[in-house]
Amino acid sequence: MADLHQNQIIDKLHNIAFKDGTFLKQVISNIIIKHNNVGFSIDISGIDKLEVEEIKNTAIKKLNEIVGIGKITIVFTESKTVEKKPQKPKHFVENVKKIILVASGKGGVGKSTISALIAQQLSLENHRVGIVDADIYGPSIPHIFGINEVPQTVGGRIIPVRAKNIEVISIGFFVKNYSAIIWRGPMASKTIYQLLSVTKWDNLDYLIIDMPPGTGDIHLSMLENYHLNGVVIVTTPQKMSEIDVVRSIDLYQKLNLPIIGIIENMSDLFDGNSGSHLSQKYNIPLIAQIPVIPKIANACDKSLPLTDLLKLSLKEYL
């Protein structure tokens, strides 16, 4: 038979659910397929342990329906319960009225392009806007905005670069082109803190923060240390993308950050309907479903205005 794919595994487990309503696909991670042998982890934190063996047997039975599947290995994991600590006072960013995160569960979904589009759209609507490129894994905002200069420092404060009437600051300004960024979580979080707090913003209505993909140290640091107004989540229609986004939704809901809405990018390129499904399931607005527009990619490459090609309706959400 042909090699197995992750989507086949997810499809077979799609409707299996725990008694509390949690779908098995929401708590699966680390799917490994080798020579048609399959292995994955299931996070059983907070789930009745009496159900675990039953769910495991059901999953194995469903997976064995796949012709030619080999050995099936399921590992159960459980997050440690962390004692609640007294909440630290959160920081406001000087001269910034609202801070909006743009996040995604995984990389490669067009999050930076959407971040730039949101910033340019708000600027077009006569708001004073800034954008922070906090994506340490691939800072692309300077390129999208056509910036080649390094910010100046005056009196110990970083002066953001202005492009397309938007104030821009990026980790990419301080890293040589094509250099790998190898930072541990605390160092990366400290750098983001400096980008936010040491930068001299000029009375902004909105500060858009292009976050790294996933739910790592930087996300937790931002949520715990700053007054934030909300997050826009970017996804694609695939089921695998949906699984990653569910983890992001869970994080933001647990830490009480309002989820402004979901933007489904590349909506016509992949099978699935992730954005609409997540919107209905979690009662989160679906801001837009954006098809693949080759001219958008070209505009990013050539640092052209994105709002000439696509406009988002943001007024009812922000």
From Swiss-Prot:
Keyword Plastid: no
GO molecular function, one term: ATP hydrolysis activity
Annotated binding of ATP, by residue: 105-112
GO biological process, one term: iron-sulfur cluster assembly
One Pfam family linked to the record: ParA
Keyword Iron carried by entry: yes
CDD domains named in the record: Mrp_NBP35
Family annotation (InterPro entries): Mrp-like_CS, Mrp/NBP35_ATP-bd, NUBPL-like, P-loop_NTPase, YlxH/NBP35
Record's keyword terms, sorted: ATP-binding, Hydrolase, Iron, Iron-sulfur, Metal-binding, Nucleotide-binding
Gene3D superfamilies named in the record: P-loop containing nucleotide triphosphate hydrolases (3.40.50.300)
HAMAP family: Mrp_NBP35
Family: Belongs to the Mrp/NBP35 ATP-binding proteins family.
Function: Binds and transfers iron-sulfur (Fe-S) clusters to target apoproteins. Can hydrolyze ATP.
Subunit structure as annotated in this protein's UniProt entry: Homodimer.
Protein name: Iron-sulfur cluster carrier protein
Organism: Rickettsia bellii (strain RML369-C)
Organismal lineage: Bacteria, Pseudomonadati, Pseudomonadota, Alphaproteobacteria, Rickettsiales
